[in-house]
Amino acid sequence: MAKLHDKYQETVSPELVKKFGFTSVMQVPRIEKITLNMGVGEAVADKKVMEHALRDMTAIAGQKPVVTVARKSVAGFKIREGYPIGCKVTLRGERMWEFLERLVDIAIPRIRDFRGMSVKSFDGRGNYAMGVREQIIFPEIEYDKIDKIRGMDIVITTSAKNDEEGRALLEGFNFPFKK
């Protein structure tokens, strides 16, 4: 079991019950999934770019990503329907907890000029979305092996009913929000 999962059950969950006055432990917000998405627009011109992006995403997530394709043709972007334009991974269960642990303890502290995560990135239903500008903040990525610095989107989906509950849940995991 991941340390953060144990921490959730032993300390975070009881604290949330006290803070919000839940009558059942099933009402306590929990993290349902973490989705990683990497848009690779350059893959239209060069097929090798997509292979590198898939390799990086596999190393970071620990599971094989799904290639996302263009839904419709856009002449301005020089893409046609069905062209591969990115990749995504949905993490649940054990891998999700392990990724969250690496994100909070290792990756976020390695972000350059970091001043805290924005509180405005909640969507109104307790889910948190963040962008990462470079994949090299993750320890699994070897700096010598990358072809290009790429960013990605990370969405943490929770069962919280509102942003206040979602923020309290993530703060329980020592998520570094701006004060």
UniProtKB/Swiss-Prot annotation:
PROSITE patterns from the UniProt entry: RIBOSOMAL_L5
GO cellular component term, pick one: ribonucleoprotein complex
GO terms (BP aspect): translation
Gene3D superfamilies: 3.30.1440.10
Transmembrane segments: none
Keywords, in A-Z order: Ribonucleoprotein, Ribosomal protein, RNA-binding, rRNA-binding, tRNA-binding
Highest taxon listed in the record's lineage: Bacteria
SUPFAM superfamilies: RL5-like (SSF55282)
Gene Ontology MF terms: rRNA binding; structural constituent of ribosome; tRNA binding
Function, in words: This is one of the proteins that bind and probably mediate the attachment of the 5S RNA into the large ribosomal subunit, where it forms part of the central protuberance. In the 70S ribosome it contacts protein S13 of the 30S subunit (bridge B1b), connecting the 2 subunits; this bridge is implicated in subunit movement. Contacts the P site tRNA; the 5S rRNA and some of its associated proteins might help stabilize positioning of ribosome-bound tRNAs.
Family statement drawn from the similarity comment of this UniProt entry: Belongs to the universal ribosomal protein uL5 family.
Summary of subunit composition and partner proteins: Part of the 50S ribosomal subunit; part of the 5S rRNA/L5/L18/L25 subcomplex. Contacts the 5S rRNA and the P site tRNA. Forms a bridge to the 30S subunit in the 70S ribosome.
NCBIfam families to which the protein is assigned, alphabetical: PRK00010.1 (NF000585)
Protein name: Large ribosomal subunit protein uL5
Organism: Shewanella piezotolerans (strain WP3 / JCM 13877)
Lineage: Bacteria, Pseudomonadati, Pseudomonadota, Gammaproteobacteria, Alteromonadales
